[in-house]
Amino acid sequence: VGFQSLSGAAERNEQILFMVVDNEGYMNTGMQRSSCTPYGAWTSTTPVGKGSGGMRSQGKTQDAKNLPLIMVNHRCEYVATASTAYMEDLYDKLDKAIQASKSGFAYLHVYSPCTTGWRFPTDQNMEVARKAVETNFVMLWEYNPRDGLHFTRSVDDPMPVTEYLKAMGRFRQLSPDQISHIQSKVVENLAFVKQMAHREA
């Protein structure tokens, strides 16, 4: 919500730390889809099953927008991704973001599962967050204009993305073709970020 003002503040390099706690949807207002909701996911506005016209819906039909990479293209003082599964990494990046915001715009994107909207037991929260990273569905990296982009946690032998997807009810309806699409996007996104890291080095 409110990307126009976020982009404007970043372009002006305002001395702001902007943190997004990303649960991949509008979870506090009824679990609606957002542009950061993953492809295939169930939400209250991307339902699963037959609709009134007899057409079968299988979740969100678009891929998620990669907001952190959009912020890198604003050439912010600092941009990073983090996960609630790796708190030391998150705290380290928060410290860096606070320092960077003293001289310009800093952006921190924290992936945080929502047990209700993602449909899994509360006691599995950390496990779901960890599997997102260990499958490369979520990548942990940081960027600044001087040092470029680099990974803070490399996953050299990732688990298949199915290990992440099957942990949540929001993906229960996926077809084999949809799962294949998601796995191919994970590989594609990883290659793209690696290319950016190489270019920025």
Spans of model-derived segments:
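Hydrophobic pocket-lining "lid/loop/helix" segments that shape and contact the acyl-thioester
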Residues: 91-95, 101, 115-118, 133
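Short, hinge-like loop/turn segments at secondary-structure boundaries
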Residues: 34-38, 124-127
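Short aromatic-enriched loop/helix-cap "lid" or pocket-rim segments at secondary-structure transitions
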Residues: 30-33, 120-122
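Conserved thiamine diphosphate
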Residues: 35-100
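Flexible, low-complexity linker and terminal segments
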Residues: 112-201
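Thiamine diphosphate
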Residues: 1-32, 85-92, 96-97
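Active-site lining segments that contact anionic ligands and/or coordinate catalytic metals
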Residues: 102-107, 146
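Short, conserved beta-strand edge motifs with alternating hydrophobic and charged residues
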Residues: 20, 79-82, 107-111
